[in-house]
């Protein structure tokens, strides 16, 4: 587990944080899961400008490469529907545009979906950038 966290922190060097869901998906892929029926942690969610959900647009801009990686992975998950994969493709294109990733199509796992989703991804990237500008 330590090696995986170290690898991910090196892979996303320069980003303020990488998406925790991507880390969880990587762990689920590499290690067996144990199913238990008990609470392990109780979390109080922050409300306001500092909360994670309120700052999600900032996270998209601050860590676009980790979001793009997560979307790539989501496009390959067997349990995802075509709709889910298409939505992931839109978000993948948006994250790549925000990250100034030039090889976004070459790196795509589902090139067909990514090409179709490209115009919507471009629109989403403009929307996210404008939301962040309004927040700041």
Predicted segments with their positions:
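Conserved nucleotide-sugar donor-binding catalytic segment
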Residues: 1-55
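Short amphipathic alpha-helical segments and their helix-coil junctions
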Residues: 3-9, 66-78, 101-108
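Sequence-level detector for tyrosine residue identity
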Residues: 7, 22, 45, 57-60, ...
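Generic secondary-structure transition motif, activating predominantly at the C-termini of alpha-helices
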Residues: 8-12, 28-31, 75, 109, ...
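Alpha-helical structural motif
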Residues: 20-23, 63-67, 89
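Catalytic core of nucleotide-sugar-dependent glycosyltransferases
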Residues: 39-46, 53-80
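Active-site-adjacent helix/loop segment of glycosyltransferases
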Residues: 78-94
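Membrane-interface aromatic/basic loop that binds lipid-linked glycans or pyrophosphate carriers
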Residues: 95-136
């Amino acid at each position: 587990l330590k090696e995986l966290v170290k690898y991910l922190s090196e892979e996303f060097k320069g980003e303020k944080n990488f998406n925790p869901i991507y880390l969880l998906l990587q762990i689920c892929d590499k290690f067996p899961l144990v199913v238990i029926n008990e609470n392990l942690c109780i979390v109080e969610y922050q409300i306001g400008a500092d909360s994670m959900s309120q700052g999600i647009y900032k996270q998209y801009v601050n860590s676009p490469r980790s979001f793009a990686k997560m979307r790539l992975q989501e496009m390959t998950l067997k349990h995802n529907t075509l709709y889910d994969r298409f939505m992931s493709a839109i978000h993948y294109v948006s994250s790549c545009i925000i990250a100034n990733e030039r090889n976004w199509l070459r790196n795509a796992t589902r090139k067909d979906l990514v090409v179709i989703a490209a115009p919507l991804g471009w629109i989403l990237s403009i929307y996210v950038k404008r939301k962040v500008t309004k927040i700041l």
